[in-house]
């Protein structure tokens, strides 16, 4: 990882310590972070991003939920939130941006603060609109939602790929996510997964018939 990303020692140590802390604080969030970073790498390649943009997107994906370390665990893992608790959760993107200080460049910090922004301007914390978001911002938002739907949490099961594709499509139609990158996620990641899951269902059905 060091050689590929050409990070300074202090940056590398920061990321390692942060991931270790997150794994101890919230295994679910840690799993989500790793999942999002892998999805982001794949999307960057499929979208044809350059080497620098890909590196920054990957680092931003790893760091995007760092602000959740400042959210009480009982709130972070609560199935149903009050309005006040949800408002507290929503502060994590700003907190993440702030905690990075001058250690990472503005492109990476913007990925952290912007991952809940929406092209239609209804996101948080700043209510940015499509023209104010970078391509990497838009990709990370799609990866974040995909992973959140896909992975199980203590209060919910993970969704099958076909349902995730349906929700992403609806979100793109409403302007909550970028349509181009939703289509890319569906075509390159979810459709092959749907095919695999359908095949597994068929195999399980055949097994039941032969018992």
Which residues are covered by each model-predicted region?
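Histidine- and acidic-residue-rich, metal-dependent catalytic cores
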Residues: 2-211
């Amino acid at each position: 990882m060091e050689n590929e990303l050409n990070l300074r020692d202090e940056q590398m140590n920061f990321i390692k310590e942060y991931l270790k802390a997150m794994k101890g604080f919230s295994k679910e969030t840690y799993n989500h972070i790793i999942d999002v970073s892998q999805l982001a790498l794949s999307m960057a390649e499929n979208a044809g991003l350059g080497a620098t943009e890909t590196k920054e997107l990957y680092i931003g994906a790893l760091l995007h939920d760092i602000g959740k370390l400042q959210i009480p665990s009982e709130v972070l893992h609560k199935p149903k939130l009050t309005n006040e608790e949800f408002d507290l959760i929503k502060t994590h993107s700003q907190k993440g941006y702030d905690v990075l200080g001058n250690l990472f460049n503005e492109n990476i910090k913007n990925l952290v603060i912007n991952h809940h922004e929406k092209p239609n301007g209804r996101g948080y914390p700043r209510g940015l609109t499509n023209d104010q978001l970078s391509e990497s911002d838009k990709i990370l938002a799609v990866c974040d939602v995909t992973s959140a739907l896909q992975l199980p949490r203590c209060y919910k099961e993970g969704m099958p790929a076909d349902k995730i594709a349906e929700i992403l499509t609806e979100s793109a139609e409403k302007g909550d996510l970028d349509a181009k990158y939703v289509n890319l996620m569906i075509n390159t990641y979810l459709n092959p997964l749907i095919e695999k899951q359908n095949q597994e269902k068929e195999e399980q059905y055949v097994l039941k018939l032969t018992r």
